[in-house]
């Protein structure tokens, strides 16, 4: 656990590991008591990505910090809208909307994600390739 709830590094928390990469929740009820949202650092390995999914009852913000990829978000009619994304791009995923991310670049893609309200990301623990990655620091 981090020494301070206000300053959290991804290496200080248990991460969610998957075949495509990992999610290290650095803010949320179980990390530092945040009540209205949760978030953290997602790392997507080259050629990796997560399948189409949604977070029932929650909105999501995705900020691409490094790497390049392809992001899909369904519009109001359920039509997939896809865009090439890179560092600095912010993606808004409306409440309960289906979306997916694919790393199309040669290096890991790093994202900062925020879920509001907190909680839907915990359903990722039910995925077949889920595993816990212990803190490094």
What are these model-derived regions, one by one?
Residues 1-37, 51, 83, 126-137:
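A short, N-terminal "cap"/entry segment at the start of jelly-roll beta-barrel domains
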Residues 28-29, 51-56, 73, 82-84, ...:
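Short histidine-centered beta-strand/loop micro-motifs
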Residues 32-35, 45-49, 66-70, 117-121:
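Short, charged/polar surface micro-motifs in flexible loops or helix N-caps
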Residues 40-56:
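Conserved short histidine dyad/triad with adjacent acidic residue
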Residues 41-42, 61, 92, 107-122:
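A short hydrophobic beta-strand segment most commonly corresponding to one strand
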Residues 48, 57-58, 97-98, 107:
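A generic "binding-loop/recognition-motif" signal
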Residues 59-87, 97:
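A short beta-strand-loop-beta hairpin characteristic of the jelly-roll/cupin
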Residues 85-104, 116:
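Conserved metal-binding segment of the jelly-roll/cupin
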């Amino acid at each position: 656990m981090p020494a301070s709830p206000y300053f959290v590094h991804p290496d200080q928390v248990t991460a969610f590991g998957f075949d495509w990469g990992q999610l290290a929740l650095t803010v949320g009820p179980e990390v530092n008591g945040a009540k209205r949202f949760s978030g953290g650092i997602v790392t997507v390995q080259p050629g990796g990505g997560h399948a189409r999914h949604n977070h029932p009852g929650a909105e999501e913000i995705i900020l691409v910090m490094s790497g390049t990829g392809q992001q899909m978000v369904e519009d109001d009619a359920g039509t997939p809208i896809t865009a090439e994304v890179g560092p600095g791009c912010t993606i808004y995923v409306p409440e309960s909307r289906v979306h997916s991310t694919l790393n199309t670049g040669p290096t890991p893609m790093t994202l900062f994600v925020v879920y509001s309200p907190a909680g839907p990301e915990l359903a990722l623990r039910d995925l077949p390739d889920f595993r816990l990655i212990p803190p490094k620091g």
